[in-house]
């Protein structure tokens, strides 16, 4: 039986009908109505389709039962033809800005399913997602469409969510079923949604600006979590595994738009690579697309090289599992439109580079020097060869450079230590030609494959998984002893973009068997540079120094030489069990440049040098490698950050300015193996000019450097090409000093006319310090150069007086003097141990939480002063922080002083990201050669106190005026992994100047901090050892979910305090400090957002990677309660979700004290004096006794309370005193408490720094004083507590606010927004002196004739309002009227409604399914309010009087909101 209709109409059909009618009011404004008919249907799917004659397995073994989206013709009887390439994917939905997408959906499957878009503007009945959002049953019909039923979804593509200026023409999103994210996805319910700029699509929906467009979904399907369970894990592209994806077709010189989706119900990363091609993504040139499960990217590619090219994810397990396909580029006779013409000057810059590289077998020592500080467990597991382990020495193959084609004289006589295991650096500019003569001096076939440049098939050097042996050419696999020449030119389409660094970081490796070749050691760095980026020597012009850091995971179990290593290094080779988890793990080496532990030598840099870091992740790792730089920040892609995330087989270029003296650490953030193995120390030091010697000595030193530091990329000139060296403006000073500006001033000067000395001087100037690419330097030699490293870097630091104690005020003062500004912000923070309960309020309703949810943890807590006696109680602004420590706020150029007290039972510290600090305020422990004075910050003992001093340089703050604040984090750094899992972490917000008040709060900004983390209690210091997983379980990767809690701010499911106004700017600061596998994709339902400082790029979801601090800006456009979640289904299902509420900006309606809607029985007080009872405390009340008043006695704390009988949003309070016999009584100051249940009371704090906010009251007995409640509060009970008063505490009150569910604003009867012509009636009363017409039925209308009266008084009369379009009506207020002395009002009434002004339906009583009769007024002037639960969804509404007093008379207001 339909809830709103007398006749039995299915709910879904009713809602469909209402929705279709509502659309007609929006067709005029839409660029286009795009209609799709989509069904969810069962399908038997074969991940490995084979020709019938090749199949020998039964159908049940080959196929899996799936639910998929398919597009149909109008009547849902004929499925539309689809591209074979789309596979499991549903049809691609497209819409331009201004369009309306209408999806007619039918469920042919056996499970309730839905359609939910990652980005679109939709109302609650087109969301397609089920959660507790306070909506009615009729609004939840979209959440889960039952089998056999239909539904129509309506999505608006507005300018607010469309692509921004810097975005590509179309942005890529996904749509999917959101009934059960894990099971729905693994069953196959997913498709692509393209949201495009206006005018970017053809009539057929294809993009105008590309020759071709393709959607590829890289996904992992866990069939055991399908609705139709069948154990299997499938690694696929568009649902095709093992290379069975139909070939993607293209023509040479095509411009292709790629829409790439990553999907998995568990955390997953993909490194998408197109062999032999380059792509452009977000205006950056890439060779690998970094993709995470739950997110999508848009990229484009221009192709020129014909052939069949591999498409794959370079994550090792993906390749092994068959996640690949092919791009087939044909010569279709199209002209070359990709090569631009160069000027004569540009042509002269073109160079030929020739390298002679061999593959050689060596014995590699992963840790030639093991510092005493190395973790003993790590050392025993990876570096010792006890327990029949191999240890730290392995036979490997490496790339080595030779001087010529004879391959007899290496460029290095002694292997340079700093270069490590890496092959020589290959560099080239756009249009340069690179020739690599490769000789295989190893014992098995190898090759060279380069990333980041377009190559021909002859120069590819890669064997594909499906290559038959007869197709393996000489270049793909060079046999032992053979020589092959690879030759390629850097094309215009390979050139770094304007936004890119001068040189972008790529790599090369052997690709006969990529996984095993890399595991064997054959890797090297490659730099692709802009036309003006390199000197004739191959040195980058805009960097003082270049430094390579390759974070490589070598899985020696997959090396070609495993058997050799077992025989040589294991004490008992015959007893080795290669499948033993402990043995296997001991052979997986986490390295930086091939070293698996810290080295005793320290990398040296000169103070103020600009270092160009080239960072790469290589190897069998299936995790992100987060690279952390201490004491400094990377400048990468226009953003300062101190953690860069490297995806497998990808690289990043970043600039680091050496501006902080001391020995610092570059290391991987994350697992124990990564942080111990992937690390190196570097020195940022001053070198005294007086030690540099005279001019002759400098020349001698230059000769030494020329000999020792000759780069591996020495150019072997094959053709004489005229080249000019043109310094960039930023290098003019250096160029003038070296006498190199004559080249530009005298164009006739050719390369042959330059002196060798000029080139040597430029080389030396660019490689000051000890660098990885130029070999090691003997200590004795360094003593005779200008670069001699001092054994104690702090000895030359003028800030240090070893004879005096450290004084934090002195440090702060020095910072303040340096920046010529005196603004110091003090914080008092303690580490305390607490019992933390992960269970939400409604734990019994959550099935996925473990039985035990309460654990001992340590948290940061704020105190008011250095006595640490009075905690700073959190207020409404801190309510959402959960487990997070207090927010540390500062402005650019401030100095932060944090006094830290350790009230816990074990050592902790404070370590800050993104800020500038001396070694004595780092809060981390490693071998940094610091004096003892500088090590006291490393670990503060229990009950100890220490003051950390941090400076806020400009790089720590917002990068432009559009960005308000930038987020970082602080945590205990004694053992970061264990400390954070124990709970010790908090946010840092650095804001523009003038944005923080004296209480350290931001001014006029709505901001929230969200910390996404899977807390693993087994990694906490406080977890009982007896409950931990066994060593065997850990070694094989078994993780018990009983002790892990995916949460936001440490609270699964029900984080509180996320409330904001519609259309206000909301700033979200998102943190992720989890390990390498902690990948979260943040989705705000119903809203889109931009990243702070990058407002030119639109986001629908945000991948939040390990060590990421992201600040985003949102302008909520839809009121209501919405879901905030991770798109990683398994984490979402287990609690990484929360609700946020968007309230109307007009949420300041009187709640009913003045009007009488709030009854006398709802108002109470602690007491009253004489006849001044609580029920009289109504704003503007009149009479002799017209307010509440009380005589305050000593030690008494009076209050007055209003029970609103439901939870509402309170946004303001109006107060008034009273006057009796010319005597004024009023409250001067008061505070507010509130409660949801009448038992647990909260004192409103707002922005006040103390425990409560004191509101300014009245200054006389008659004036109304209004106070704003910000942030808004949700409560049922409100109490006002007078603290200061005149004569006696006295109140007349009105509360301002709205309903929690939203959609409760007046629709326009009282204001006149509803026109007179839109109000009609069955009849109206006319007299010779007045007419009681329908349009007079407006609430609170004044005058002698101020209401609607019908001509006759009977039950056939009605008042009708036409709202002009489909509207959600949530409540009504009725009022009577007075004529002469006659009180007229309606005592009872019913409601009818319709959407077509024809078929009227009565509003039914939910309990009886009969027409509901509402109780009306009891007098002619008072208000009575009724709520429609469920709400009415209609255009027309009628009020039908049933009984009345004297005569029918009505004044009304309707409340609700528009549906669209």
UniProtKB/Swiss-Prot annotation:
Pfam families assigned: Cu-oxidase_3, F5_F8_type_C
GO-annotated biological processes: venom-mediated blood coagulation
Glycan attachment sites: 156, 242, 300, 385, 406, 471, 557, 943, 1000, 1180, 1397
Tissue specificity of this protein: Expressed by the venom gland.
Region feature (Disordered): 740-760
Residues reported to bind Ca(2+) 1: 124, 139, 142-143
Stretches for region B: 693-817
Domain Plastocyanin-like: 32-196, 206-330, 351-529, 539-685, 823-991, 1000-1143
Gene Ontology MF annotations: copper ion binding; peptidase activator activity; signaling receptor activity; toxin activity
Main location as per UniProt: secreted
Residue ranges listed under propeptide: 772-817
Signal sequence, renumbered to the chain: 1-30
Entries under InterPro entries matching the protein: Cu-oxidase-like_N, Cu_oxidase_CS, Cupredoxin, FA58C, Factor_5/8-like, Galactose-bd-like_sf, Neuropilin_MCO_CoagFactor
Site (Cleavage): 771-772, 817-818
SUPFAM superfamilies documented for this protein: Cupredoxins, Galactose-binding domain-like
Family to which the UniProt record says this protein belongs: Belongs to the multicopper oxidase family.
Assembly description: Heterodimer of a light and a heavy chains; non-disulfide-linked. The interaction between the two chains is calcium-dependent. Found in its active form associated with omicarin-C catalytic subunit (AC Q58L95).
The protein's name: Venom prothrombin activator omicarin-C non-catalytic subunit
Naturally occurring in which organism (per UniProt): Oxyuranus microlepidotus (Inland taipan)
Lineage: Eukaryota, Metazoa, Chordata, Craniata, Vertebrata
